[in-house]
Amino acid sequence: MNIKKLFSRMGSPSLVLTFVIACPFLLFICQSHSVAAYDLDYGKVYEDSKVVSKKLNLSVYYEALNPSCATFIVKNLARIFDNGLNTILNLRLIPWGNAYVNKSSNAIVCQNGSDECQLNTLQACTVNVLRDVNKHFALIYCFEFLVIEGRYKDWRTCFSSLGLNQKPVLNCINSVNGTKLEQKYAIETAQLNPPHTFVPWVVVNNQPIGKDYNNFTAYACKAYKGNSAPIACQ
């Protein structure tokens, strides 16, 4: 996926300018990656076993309308595509956070209201439908940028800005699949050990890094046992 071309389609000059400032990987043309097939729990990744065995799992547990989560994704996490860290990571985005299921109504309740529930499901479907991490991260980056700008209700514009077809993602949201994805994320988040106490909750190879989440690169580099360390680890 050519990230530079992808973001050059964005219609908002302020969005493009801020992306350049916050995330230099706009100028970086990502190397091609094998396409991974994710099942509904986003826990199984089917790729070349030799590639997967050398990669680290970087899991980010977050919620769509949380300001700290949006800032982390836009201004920090996005840098992995510029400094090469993405080449040693299986990036997993789990949009559930502090949501819970109301036991009497079985309805999902989100910390920041029903809009956040919709955006959590939107992002869960984005990851599930757009299996290429470059594509689904670019779209989620756009969603979270709009959260920072206070324009999150304009999320549909991200599809047109990036030249992506919204229909498959919307079909997921409006079907039972969207709910199933969120239910599985709820179970996964509840099984965190130790339990998460805030968001974003960042886990490197099953090791939570707590309040030092903005320094996740150092933890990833320390955990990496491969032979070809990316620029970020040198």
Regions found by a protein language model. Give the residues of each.
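Sterically constrained small-residue positions within well-ordered secondary structures
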Residues: 49, 82-84, 193
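Juxtamembrane luminal stem/stalk of type II transmembrane Golgi/ER carbohydrate-processing enzymes
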Residues: 35-41
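Eukaryotic intrinsically disordered and solvent-exposed regulatory patches
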Residues: 44-46, 77-79, 182-190
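C-terminal cap of thioredoxin/glutaredoxin-like
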Residues: 2-23, 30-35, 58-61, 147-234
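A short beta-strand-turn-helix
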Residues: 41-56
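A compositional signature for long Ser/Thr(±Pro)-rich, low-complexity
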Residues: 26-28, 41
